[in-house]
Amino acid sequence: MNAQEANFDGLVGPTHNYAGLSFGNVASLNNEKSAANPKAAAKQGLRKMKQLADLGFAQGVLPPQERPSLRLLRELGFSGKDADVIAKAAKQAPELLAAASSASAMWTANAATVSPSADTGDGRVHFTPANLCSKLHRAIEHDATRRTLSTLFADPAHFAVHEALTGTPALGDEGAANHTRFCAEYGKPGVEFFVYGRAEYRRGPEPKRFPARQTFEASRAVAQRHGLDETATVYAQQDPDVIDAGVFHNDVISVGNRDTLFTHERAFVNKQAIYDTLTATLDARGARLNVIEVPDAAVSVNDAVTSYLFNSQLLSRADGSQVLVVPQECRENAKVAAYLDELAAGNGPIRDVLVFDLRESMKNGGGPACLRLRVVLNDAERAAVTSNVWMNDTLFASLDAWIEKHYRDRLAPEDLADPTLLDESRTALDELTQILRVGSLYDFQR
């Protein structure tokens, strides 16, 4: 059956700020306490969605989550009216208010792991929301993620939306940022590739400076609950040294699509064995793996992290050629820019490079790949997504006007204590649910 890979990008929320909450994420730590521009952030992401939709790629939208999270603050012991809760948290524990106010759900690559119906045992598209248990500000996302996915992908004949795995370090799950899929065609059975940072119950190398957020046990559990064919499922360990260099998810050092793996030479432990396994497994499903390995001599790990070369989108055109979507920081790094020029001029599958200004997201450690969740859908499954979430001229105009109306153009850490920010956000999100036709999605609407 005909199928297409859709990218569902997260709309940046009204509380987008730089609180430095993500240890192991170099950009997040480096920009801590600086002022953010939520309006610019949201519009930068929206423009990327629109341009890719205009180029013929299937592009969807995922709404922001409600922030600040009064549920979290009340759980942590702050009481009273909503304004009182925010005031108490701001005075007594501003770091907790920052965690409750994070707009990190914008990075939907961490929202869930998705397996298309061509790969699963029951022939449905399976979603497992990521528990994101390594960081408080992200561990509060999965309930709302499940609600959103269950709203958009509601037909049980086509979709299965699971609960997140239990939020324990042994099952640390960071979603699709550590997962990719290879195939001959999107609608045919493929090979699912899970990358982990450490194993809870197996001896092996681990990072020493920054934590490994994804475990082997979590990856295996997701594959099992999705009913994947064991002979078409490959696991690999990310090199702990690159985690210590700031590669907190695999999508900061590697990206794959269809029959192509674009990766850094230092991305994996036992890389040649991984390449060989992927090649043999994909060959059994009718495709030949193309490995584009970037040598450290051309682009160092540090350059990869600062430019986010690999936190890119690798998209297939109808003619089979591929385009790489990168942040503008790649053009500002001389070595990375030179490599990209050489790549596009070569005879490989990647023929074009598209550059986007995503500066606001990048300063928090999120490039093009972070902002999107890939969902392969056949024609019947796409028709079952009935909400108004597919990017087109009309939706773009509505969302652009909505952002202009509701978002601030400056948000500093001290502004999180402003109780009117909660009211502004709720007003904006209430209107957004009407634009996207997703019903009463948020707690404050119920």
From Swiss-Prot:
Query: Its Gene Ontology molecular function terms?
Result: N-succinylarginine dihydrolase activity
**Which residue positions are annotated as catalytic?**
174, 249, 370
**UniProt catalytic activity:** N(2)-succinyl-L-arginine + 2 H2O + 2 H(+) = N(2)-succinyl-L-ornithine + 2 NH4(+) + CO2
GO biological process assignments: arginine catabolic process to glutamate; arginine catabolic process to succinate
SUPFAM superfamilies found in the cross-reference section: Pentein
Claim: Hydrolase is one of the keywords in the record: yes
Task: Extract the InterPro entries matched here.
Answer: AstB_sf, SuccinylArg_d-Hdrlase_AstB
Q: What is its EC number?
A: 3.5.3.23
Where on the tree of life does the source sit, at the highest rank? Bacteria
Key words of the record: Arginine metabolism, Hydrolase
The keyword Transport is assigned to this record: no
Q: Which family does it belong to?
A: Belongs to the succinylarginine dihydrolase family.
* Subunit structure comment from the entry: Homodimer.
Its biological purpose is as follows: Catalyzes the hydrolysis of N(2)-succinylarginine into N(2)-succinylornithine, ammonia and CO(2).
Q: What is this protein called?
A: N-succinylarginine dihydrolase
Question: From which source organism is this entry?
Answer: Burkholderia ambifaria (strain ATCC BAA-244 / DSM 16087 / CCUG 44356 / LMG 19182 / AMMD) (Burkholderia cepacia (strain AMMD))
